Amino acid sequence: MLHQKIAHKVRKVVVPGISLLIFFQGCLILLFLQLTYKTLYCRNDIRKQIGLNKTKRLFIVLVSSILHVVAPSAVRITTENSSVPKGTFFLDLKKKRILSHLKSNSVAICNHQIYTDWIFLWWLAYTSNLGANVFIILKKSLASIPILGFGMRNYNFIFMSRKWAQDKITLSNSLAGLDSNARGAGSLAGKSPERITEEGESIWNPEVIDPKQIHWPYNLILFPEGTNLSADTRQKSAKYAAKIGKKPFKNVLLPHSTGLRYSLQKLKPSIESLYDITIGYSGVKQEEYGELIYGLKSIFLEGKYPKLVDIHIRAFDVKDIPLEDENEFSEWLYKIWSEKDALMERYYSTGSFVSDPETNHSVTDSFKINRIELTEVLILPTLTIIWLVYKLYCFIF
């Protein structure tokens, strides 16, 4: 018994320590690869983008692998048959992991509970072989993080200051780039915008589709709530709800509509689907906050993690979303979040998003990635650690 306690304590220290070391080494290696691709292919945008996309895919492989080791959660994905065809997510018995057939050009929106939500959303795209095509809208301050900030800028993530007057041009040009390249009519196809406004906004022709060029997919991830759920943000959300004359929700924060509406408008020529995702974590009660239970320190250093991550997905055709009228869109989004709040209410009551096998499809497995890519991204950091351990052993003995 004492043996087991000691082994457990050692594991809680050694595994997170080695995992974090591998993570930082992996990030440095990916950063080196980014610099290599940018240098070697500085005059070949397509080859450079292919190389950078490879490092982006390997980054989610790296992060997912670390998370799978320190927090081996199971994942249960539930989809609504009415909007997401049954079998879109499935367990591949040969590859022994969850795969999917998500649309190539899409936007994913989700409630925001803990800091690692984005990893699961990125992993969902990865199951459809879109891990290299994920784009995330983030706070501008994150771009200044040493090493990671540089890497994220190379991934063309979109950084927002939360001041719409400043963010509009940044968001417009980033989204226009995604849209035009998805149609084979953007800068990666050697094309130029029709014009550039005095404010610096690039205007592209939304009707041009070039079948001879590469069409670059995108999966844009947004959190309309703007921040994760906490006592402080709940209070701020309630004040915001009172300001706009809306009833605050019980289980989610009030969403902001401006950025999402603008994104859907700019991507309209190429977007195929809007995925509405709701995440629930086992071990978090209705009156509790996920960020306090499953914070970064708790997950990566203390070994506290949800045993089961529940993900509910439904899809919307952008043609059915009222994008032209701002008030109508705000009402539509409020309705979507009201349904999300009710979904979370059911989750807290039953512990699942599954309601009826006739209307829902569900698949459950552990949080896995491609073994070949896993080897590819971990081999150098692992060999480095083995070398360091060997040197330490030689020094001591």
From Swiss-Prot:
Disruption phenotype: Phosphoinositides (PIPs) with stearic acyl chains are strongly disturbed. Induces disturbances in intracellular trafficking, alterations in the budding pattern and defects in actin cytoskeleton organization. GO terms for molecular function: acyltransferase activity. GO terms for biological process: phosphatidylinositol acyl-chain remodeling; phospholipid biosynthetic process. InterPro entries: Acyltransf_C, Plipid/glycerol_acylTrfase. GO terms for cellular component: endomembrane system; endoplasmic reticulum; lipid droplet. It catalyses: 1-heptadecanoyl-sn-glycero-3-phosphate + octadecanoyl-CoA = 1-heptadecanoyl-2-octadecanoyl-sn-glycero-3-phosphate + CoA; 1-heptadecanoyl-sn-glycero-3-phosphate + tetradecanoyl-CoA = 1-heptadecanoyl-2-tetradecanoyl-sn-glycero-3-phosphate + CoA; 1-heptadecanoyl-sn-glycero-3-phosphate + hexadecanoyl-CoA = 1-heptadecanoyl-2-hexadecanoyl-sn-glycero-3-phosphate + CoA. Keywords: Acyltransferase, Lipid biosynthesis, Lipid droplet, Lipid metabolism, Phospholipid biosynthesis, Phospholipid metabolism, Transferase. Its EC number is 2.3.-.-. It comes from the Eukaryota. A motif (HXXXXD motif) lies at residues 112-117. Pfam families: Acyltransf_C (PF16076), Acyltransferase (PF01553). Belongs to the 1-acyl-sn-glycerol-3-phosphate acyltransferase family. Acyltransferase with lysophosphatidic acid acyltransferase (LPAAT) activity. Fatty acyl substrates include 18:0-acyl-CoA, 16:0-acyl-CoA, 17:0-acyl-CoA and 14:0-acyl-CoA. Responsible for the acyl-CoA-dependent introduction of saturated very long chain fatty acids (VLCFAs) into phosphatidylinositol, transferring saturated FAs with 18 to 26 carbon atoms. Responsible for the incorporation of stearate into phosphatidylinositol. Overexpression has an effect on chromosome stability. Regulates phosphorylation and expression of glycerol-3-phosphate acyltransferase SCT1. Present with 2010 molecules/cell in log phase SD medium. The HXXXXD motif is essential for acyltransferase activity and may constitute the binding site for the phosphate moiety of the glycerol-3-phosphate. This is 2-acyl-1-lysophosphatidylinositol acyltransferase. It comes from Saccharomyces cerevisiae (strain ATCC 204508 / S288c). The gene is CST26.
